[in-house]
Regions:
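Membrane-proximal alpha-helical signals and transmembrane carboxylates
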Residues: 1-345
Length: 345
């Protein structure tokens, strides 16, 4: 006898697409291909195609929020350099269902690298509608993997490696339109400003020898955006406090209890954070001209009257806005683990 059920290599999901003159029509046209009624309450993730994101996402967001079945907490991502079909055709090595793979990536990136963070449909919609603030959402791209041939003793074996996906930085918007892509370090620079950088690794050079590298594990961090008016012009001061602890050290580690070297490491850590924020500022102010940091919103909160005078001209003010950075880095004591393995030998 044989047990009923699908073959072990059969996909546990079905990919289907439809078209229409409007989003609602395209959704209704799905009924011509699906024998079952689609329940949108099960939807956990929305992927935005690059071309559609560049033309504007308001119609899609409006559709999602008007549908009483759709969860406003559903995550949203933007696809880069690929079509939705190409993304849906990829495989996750350790997950049979793509949606579990996407959520695994989001969890890992947020808690391990701080180069991206989840955004829901509701959060994206609110940032689009909020004055003085532009949204950023995770960026997804396809990782191309060529077919491989591997030889085993006495035989030839062909191994087909499917394409996969990865979260690579973030997508920057201006109003409801995609305007560009942030690389990993630029994305973390945005997260430093927003106070969302909680995990990841910073690499600094050893104060004793620039040829040696030290890995710093990012701990807790916080930020404060302080708007000021100096000589009748707006100025932003960003204060970032970050904790870290040395995780990997090239060479002798006995210097960790030397106060002057410890202070030098903290200065170098602060310099790396400053550099990442500067990279993000350059992208936001010069490349995209999009206030992805919410500086305008900070001015509105502190100076509501003055904001009414400058808000219509904010798009011209923001690219040349002076931003002052105050970075405070604190390294935790290494505890009992001081001597490295090589030194102990």
């Amino acid at each position: 006898t044989s047990s009923a059920g699908p073959p072990i290599d059969e996909k546990p999901y079905w990919t289907v697409s439809s078209t229409g003159q409007t989003c609602y029509q395209a959704i209704r046209n799905l009924s011509t291909q699906s024998p079952r009624i689609i329940f949108w309450g099960h939807n956990r993730l929305t992927l935005l195609g690059e071309n559609m994101a560049k033309s504007g996402v308001s119609e899609v967001l409006d559709l999602l929020q008007r549908n009483h079945e759709v969860r406003s907490s559903m995550d949203v991502m933007s696809v880069r350099n690929a079509s939705i079909d190409e993304v849906m055709a990829t495989m996750f090595e350790l997950e049979r269902q793509p949606v579990k793979g996407f959520f695994g990536l989001l969890w890992s990136i947020q808690r391990r690298n701080s180069t991206s963070f989840p955004q829901s449909v509701l959060e994206l919609s609110r940032k689009i509608e909020t004055e003085g603030m532009e949204p950023v959402i995770p960026s997804v791209e396809v990782v191309n993997r060529s077919d491989e041939e591997t030889a085993a003793p006495g035989q030839l074996r062909e191994e087909v490696v499917m394409d996969s996906v990865r979260i690579n930085g973030m997508a920057a918007f201006k109003e409801d339109k995609l305007v560009g892509w942030l690389a990993d370090r630029e994305s973390r620079g945005v997260l430093w400003v927003l106070g969302k950088a909680q995990r990841g690794i910073l690499v600094i050079r050893d104060p004793r020898d620039d040829n040696n590298l030290i890995s710093i594990r990012i701990g807790a961090s916080s930020s404060k955006i302080v708007p000021e008016i100096v000589d009748d012009r707006p100025v932003i001061r960003v204060v970032v406090e970050a904790e870290g602890d040395p995780l990997e050290i090239d060479g002798d580690a006995s210097f960790l209890h030397h106060p002057e070297i410890w202070a030098s490491m903290e200065r170098r850590m602060a310099a790396v954070i400053r550099n990442e924020i500067q990279m993000a500022l350059t992208a936001g102010q010069q490349q995209f001209q999009s206030d992805i940091f919410g500086f305008g919103r900070a001015f509105y909160s502190k100076y509501p009257h003055e904001w009414q005078l400058i808000k219509d001209n904010w798009d011209n003010i923001f690219p040349t806005l002076e931003v002052q950075l105050d970075i405070i880095a604190n390294l935790k004591e290494p505890g009992l683990t001081v001597e490295g393995v090589r030194q102990a030998q």
